[in-house]
């Protein structure tokens, strides 16, 4: 969708007029090497979003030894475009299928790993302590129990499955 917005601004306007006010945009790095799929198109896509009043969430897939050294740069790029980029949703890569341990360890990165790298790459401007876990499924089941007066199952996820902060 970002490449389409970059190449065809009219399509971006049509999407906005159809009611879409936010675009989740793949953005894996600040260099052509780490973000080959849409590095050159990103500025044009942001310009289209700026003109149409569409906000953007960058969604980088983070892969250890590939782009984990650019997390601070991604945040800085988002800050430079704060008028249109309202969030960055870092997604550690999901490795599935048959893969040897050494290869898995080469690329695997966790949310806590990302948070640590962000602190290092922002020179402590965004610290590990600035983050909080975002799992919010359990309160929903508690509300359902309160309204139904019947015990329900609890939906929960591991605390390290997500983290958020505001900067």
Q: At which residue positions do the language-model features occur?
A:
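Radical SAM/AdoMet-radical enzyme domain recognition
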Residues: 1-92
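A C-terminal junction/extension of Radical SAM enzymes
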Residues: 94-167
